[in-house]
């Protein structure tokens, strides 16, 4: 319980997009991104290096690559708009950069949902020393 309280307090200090990303993951994948993907494999969480360990970790790798292509705004703080139409997330708004960030998050949330069967607890808190292989290009 104390851990959940700490996570809630930390989440309140996070701005814009990372909160939206968490909400999008919860809506699409029906699980908490913060609890499930903040420290998973070599790419889920802050930074990322080495090779993705499984399909779930690859979702984070692709998400990192997608954020890396965003140039006109900060993907970690840019707030975007989206709606749900016929059960699908649709990114909206007039700002192309924010829409691009939304698309990165939307695709990642769908990837997490589609790869729930690959999720393996052995990759939670995965040691960075196991992520030393040469990374593949985005």
Swiss-Prot record:
Localisation per UniProt entry: Secreted
What Enzyme Commission number(s) apply to this enzyme? 3.1.1.4
Q: According to its UniProt record, which protein family does this protein belong to?
A: Belongs to the phospholipase A2 family. Group II subfamily. D49 sub-subfamily.
Molecular function terms in GO for this entry?
Answer: calcium ion binding; calcium-dependent phospholipase A2 activity; phospholipid binding; toxin activity
Alphabetized UniProt keyword annotations = Calcium, Disulfide bond, Hemostasis impairing toxin, Hydrolase, Lipid degradation, Lipid metabolism, Metal-binding, Platelet aggregation inhibiting toxin, Secreted, Signal, Toxin
Give the UniProt tissue specificity note: Expressed by the venom gland.
By its UniProt entry, which SUPFAM superfamilies does this protein fall under? Phospholipase A2, PLA2
Cofactor names from the entry are:
Ca(2+)
Q: What class of enzyme is it?
A: hydrolase
This one is known as: Acidic phospholipase A2 Cvv-E6e
What reaction does this enzyme carry out catalytically? a 1,2-diacyl-sn-glycero-3-phosphocholine + H2O = a 1-acyl-sn-glycero-3-phosphocholine + a fatty acid + H(+)
Q: Name one Pfam family in it.
A: Phospholip_A2_1
Source species: Crotalus viridis viridis (Prairie rattlesnake)
Q: Which InterPro entries match?
A: PLipase_A2, PLipase_A2_Asp_AS, PLipase_A2_dom, PLipase_A2_dom_sf, PLipase_A2_His_AS
What function does this protein fulfil? Snake venom phospholipase A2 (PLA2) that significantly inhibits ADP-induced platelet aggregation in platelet-rich plasma of human, rabbit and guinea pig. PLA2 catalyzes the calcium-dependent hydrolysis of the 2-acyl groups in 3-sn-phosphoglycerides.
> Which SMART domains does this chain map to?
PA2c
Q: Which cysteine residues pair off into disulfide bonds?
A: 42-131, 44-60, 59-111, 65-138, 66-104, 73-97, 91-102
Q: Taxonomically, which superkingdom?
A: Eukaryota
Task: Name a single GO cellular component.
Answer: extracellular region
Residues the record marks as active site: 63, 105
In this chain, Ca(2+) is annotated as bound at 43, 45, 47, 64
Q: Which PROSITE patterns match?
A: PA2_ASP, PA2_HIS
State the Gene Ontology BP annotations. Answer: arachidonate secretion; lipid catabolic process; negative regulation of T cell proliferation; phospholipid metabolic process
Instruction: Give the signal peptide range.
Output: 1-16
